[in-house]
Each structure stands twice: as C-alpha cells, then as structure tokens.
A protein has these predicted regions:
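N-terminal "domain-start" segment that seeds a small globular fold
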Residues: 1-19
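Amphipathic alpha-helical repeat scaffolds
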Residues: 10, 30-34
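Thiol-based oxidoreductase modules, predominantly thioredoxin-like and allied folds used
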Residues: 55-72, 88-99
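Short, internal strand/loop/helix patches
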Residues: 75-120
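Thiol-/selenol-based redox modules, centered on thioredoxin-like
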Residues: 104-107, 111-154
C-alpha cells in the first residue's frame, strides 16, 4: 500500500484521493484552532506561499483529540483559519489521529514514521514519490522545516 491508495474527505465533505497529490511534496499536519501552537498557521501559510508554485502542498487535518482544542464544525474551523491566518492550503474534515478509529492517512503516516502522535501540529513530510521522509514534533516551527522542503523540491 502507498499513500496514494488512501482517500480522505475535505472540509466540504468531498472525497479526495491522495493520488491527486502524486508528484508533489507534501507537509501533512494535524491541527487545532485553540492550541498554543495555533499561531504556527502563520508560518505554515508563509511556507505554502513560498513553495506552492514549485509543487508543494500543505494538507491540514484538524483534530480534536488533544484537550478538545479543535472545537466547532469543519466550516467554523475553516472560517477561523481564513479570517485569522489567511490560510489558502487545503483543509480536510476533522479527524482522529490515534486509536482504533484514527483516520487511515494518519495510521499510514505513523506506520512509516513510528510512534503515537502526542499533540497538535505534528508534521509529516512526504516526497514527490509518496515516501514519508520525515516527522516533526509540534514544537518544530514551520520555518525550521523549510530547508527540508527545499531539498525535496525540483
């Protein structure tokens, strides 16, 4: 199985195949709007704007598993991120990242880069061939990931 075999649901309820992202470098992040790390949205958006034209995407998966910090509907979360951080990268339906009912995408990511997700804003870097090449803890700021992204872009 590869990451491209997985299907996810966007924040409007549409099914999206991860194969739509073949050939792109991806940063997949579990997020929350009420977390101490929420201001990382600003750095994520800056990185997105810097690299999107070179084949880079950030995939935002809100998660309410950690201290219930992603409250509200998918629409409310999207509105919060757009109004407060002007984010333009793709946002998906709120999911779980740990446990038996974790989203398939996060089960896969954790198989590739071992370990439970401990908090919001854990980041997984995927190369253009679909390989999960790195995992960054929530304390890693987006600007500290830019060099790793740059190396993967053609």
């Amino acid at each position: 199985m590869s990451i491209y075999d997985i299907k996810v649901t966007d924040n409007k309820g549409n099914e999206v195949s991860m194969s739509d992202y073949k050939g792109k470098v991806l940063l997949i992040v579990n997020t929350a709007t009420g977390c101490g790390f929420t201001p990382q949205y600003e750095g994520l958006e800056k990185m997105y704007e810097k690299f999107v034209d070179r084949g880079f995407e950030i995939l935002d998966f809100p998660c309410n598993q950690f201290a219930f910090q992603a409250k509200g509907s998918d629409e409310q979360i999207h509105e919060f991120c757009t109004l407060n951080y002007n984010t333009k990268f793709p946002r998906f339906k709120k999911i779980k990242v740990n446990g038996g009912d974790a989203a398939e995408i996060f089960k896969y990511l954790k198989e590739q880069k071992k370990g439970r997700i401990k908090w919001n804003f854990t980041k997984f870097l995927v190369d253009a061939e679909g390989n999960v090449v790195d995992r960054f803890e929530p304390t890693t700021k987006p600007e500290d990931i830019e060099a790793s992204v740059e190396k993967l872009l053609k």
